Amino acid sequence: HILALDTAQEDCGAAILLADGSLFMHVEHVGSRHSERLLPMVRDLIHEAGIEKTDLGLIAFGEGPGSFTGLRVACGAAQGLAWALEVPVAQVSNLEALAEWLRETHLEAVRPGTRIAVLNDARMHECYAGMWRVPAAAEDRLERLDGPVLVAPEDAQTYLERFKADMLCGSGSKVYSEAMKIRSDGGIRMVNAADSHPDAIARIARRMALSGGTIRPELAHPVYVRNRVALTMAERAAGERL
C-alpha cells in the first residue's frame, strides 16, 4: 500500500493507494497550515482505508517545485513516516503529477505521443514549467522532455511552440493569462486543473517502485528550482510570498 503526500501549493492533499487499486484521498484548501493538517489527514485516511500504518510499504511525496515551506512539510513528513516504518520513499515531481492527472482524466484526447505541458504559478511573475510525452504503453510512466524550469509568462508561447505542446494545464495559465497571450489558434488544448493531485503522485510512485526508482528516507529532498528560498523580514511584512 502506498501513502502519497502533497503540500506544494495552498491545498493540502494525501492519498492511499491500496495494492488492489482502491484509492482513498483527502484534499483541503489550507493556505499555509499544511503542518497542522497533514498528519491528522493521514490518520483519517488510514482509518478510512481500513488498514494499519504498519501496512504501508511506500511513502511518496510531491517534491516540487512549489511553495518552499509546503515542500519541506511533505518531505519531512515522508521522511519521518518512512524511517519509523522502515520503508522507502518515492519523490515525485508535482508538475509530472499534473501531467499524469491530465493523462488519466482526458483519455478521449490523449494518445501515444501527445505532448503535455504544465505551467504552474511560481510567484514573482514566473512559472514553473515542464513538458511530458505520453508513451505507447498505458502502464508506462510519462516521458519527461523538459523541466522543471522557470519561464516568464511572456515566454510561455515560445516555450510551448519549442516543444510542440498539444495540451496545457497548471495554475500559471490562469494567473498570468493576459501576459502569456497563448494563441487560441495554436492547436493547444488548455485544461483547468486543481492544484493538488496526491492520487496521481501515488500512481507514479507505484511505477517508480516497480522500476527501482525509490530511495532511502535520508536521501529525500525538495526540488525548489529557484535559488531564492527565503524572504527578508521586510518582504514578509510587505506580504510577499515565494
Segments and roles (model prediction):
Residues 29-37, 68-72, 76, 192-196:
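Residues at secondary-structure transition points
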Residues 47-54, 82-92, 109-111:
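Phosphate-handling active-site elements
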